[in-house]
């Protein structure tokens, strides 16, 4: 009962911060990731309170958020302690969210994620692929002023730099199964885009 109340407080807090975010790292994304992470975590026998908490706060420190929205690691930690999750649990959550980003993957060679961290990372990556991943890719490009194609910062280039690589980077068997259909849909979309815009690959490379 205590953890349920804490989770609800954290949800309300995170939602108040991310409601107006427009780059695809908004409250809807976080809510989907939390649901996916809980599903994966249950299948993988993880600590579901840690999974849900880490999923809810995972984007608050992301550099892709505007400075006016993004929080520091210490601010997130202090708020979790304020909600009563305890310093040990707060430490576990911080360990996850500071190592799960695509750009942080080098850290994992030295300090692999816990099963809770793997569940959250997989959920975040699943939300970056498939139909919702395609939609988010264009939301992000639009928010940052990047084009559809034509250079290395374009939405089209992002599929090759990151999104089409994520299927093979899933940690858990559960996520690997879920990723297959999403990856194939995304690949089909990219191939159709290349048919619709002849030479798009040459213009982007």
Swiss-Prot record:
It holds the Pfam family HD. Transmembrane segments: none annotated. This is Uncharacterized protein YpgQ. The gene is ypgQ. CDD domains: HDc. It comes from the Bacteria. Gene3D superfamilies: 1.20.58.1910, HD-domain/PDEase-like. SMART domains: HDc. InterPro entries: HD/PDEase_dom, HD_domain.
